[in-house]
Design a protein with these regions (language model features):
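Conserved N-terminal beta1-alpha1 strand-loop-helix module at the mouth
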Residues: 1-94, 108-111, 168, 251-257, ...
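Active-site-adjacent beta->alpha loops and helix N-cap segments on the catalytic face
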Residues: 1-11, 56-66, 76-88, 106-113, ...
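Hydrophobic faces of well-ordered beta-strands that scaffold small-molecule active sites
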Residues: 19-23, 48-50, 97-101, 126-128, ...
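Catalytic cores of alpha/beta
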Residues: 30-40, 158-168, 210, 214-230
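Glycine-rich phosphate-binding active-site loops on the catalytic face of alpha/beta enzymes
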Residues: 45-56, 125-127, 176-184, 213, ...
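Alpha-helix-loop-beta-strand connector modules within alpha/beta enzyme cores
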Residues: 63-98, 141-151, 155, 192-208, ...
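Active-site/ligand-binding-proximal alpha/beta "capping" segment
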Residues: 113-116, 175-180, 184-229
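Alpha/beta catalytic cores of nucleotide-metabolism and tRNA/nucleoside-modifying enzymes
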Residues: 198-204, 215-272
Length: 272
């Protein structure tokens, strides 16, 4: 049983919802990024989404765009991003790790080499935000053949016909984008999301995770109540940004502030 399936089954058996955290690899630098990522599991995180920095992140709002810029400026590459996963696995072999990003860096790296290296280093799933289901056959087939979960995005504007097409080949979990537009710029209404999720649940048995627009512990609790889990990204990255010094470098409070905020979300979801 792969890590994603095992994690969601264990959480379901314990009547809990999954907390996923998104962080850009190498933001604000490789060492700080790695320290935060390796400390996520003991701070209540159930799965990790690692953003692969890209110079043109069109689906992301200012927060994640700036995060990518800081990471690239610090020297982060896709190769180093994969090495971060390898280093996390040296300390934790249980938590699911999903890479999230854009197709261009994967294409430049080499699709087969990317999948091979990702699996070798301990990646469990892949989310490619700018690769439509109609155009991802080669990367999808190679990923699925090698047991790398290909996680699909569904948005509020996805119609029923397209929804069935997307779900047909989905694996791992379903990532529901709760807002239209770019990341981190607005929040979704619980009732609207709940109706959409009810429609999706009729067509798949995969866990459904809500992302985009979750910024507070209260929102995390509310959204997790209607889903199998949630992802918090921009709000965590904003916490990192707020702790940086005048040179946009990590300060003595960066790691602590970030993990403290994540713990607040986790505790709220666990009713602690």
């Amino acid at each position: 049983m792969n890590r994603i399936k095992k994690t969601f089954e264990n959480l379901k058996n314990n009547n809990r919802k999954a907390l996923g955290i998104f962080l850009t690899a190498g933001d604000p630098d490789m060492d700080t990024s790695l320290e935060i990522l390796t400390k996520l599991p003991p701070n209540g995180v159930d799965f990790i989404e690692i953003g692969m920095p890209f110079s043109d992140p069109m689906a992301d709002g200012p927060t994640i765009q700036e995060s990518s810029e800081r990471a690239l400026k610090s020297g982060m590459t896709l190769k180093k991003c994969l090495l971060i996963v390898k280093k996390i696995r040296e300390k934790n072999n249980e938590i699911p790790i999903i890479l999230m990003g854009y197709y261009n860096p994967i294409y430049q790296y080499g699709r087969k080499l990317f999948v091979k290296t990702a699996l070798e280093y301990g990646v469990d799933g892949l989310i490619v935000v700018d690769l439509p289901a109609e155009e991802d056959e080669e990367l999808y087939n190679y990923s699925e053949k090698n047991n790398l979960s290909f996680i699909r995005l569904i948005t509020p504007t996805t119609n029923h016909t397209r929804l069935k097409h997307i779900l047909k080949d989905a694996s791992g979990f379903i990532y529901y984008v709760s807002i239209t537009g770019i990341t981190g710029t607005q929040s979704a209404k619980l009732t609207e999301v709940s109706i959409k999720l009810d429609n999706i649940k009729q067509l798949t048995n995969l866990p459904i995770v809500i992302g985009f627009g979750i910024r507070t512990p209260k929102q995390a609790l509310d959204m997790s109540s209607i889903s199998d889990g949630i992802v918090v990204g921009s709000a965590v990255v904003d916490t990192i940004k707020a702790s940086l010094d005048n040179n946009q470098a990590a300060s003595s409070s960066t790691v602590f502030n970030c993990l403290n905020f994540i713990s607040e979300i986790s505790n709220k979801m666990r009713h602690i």
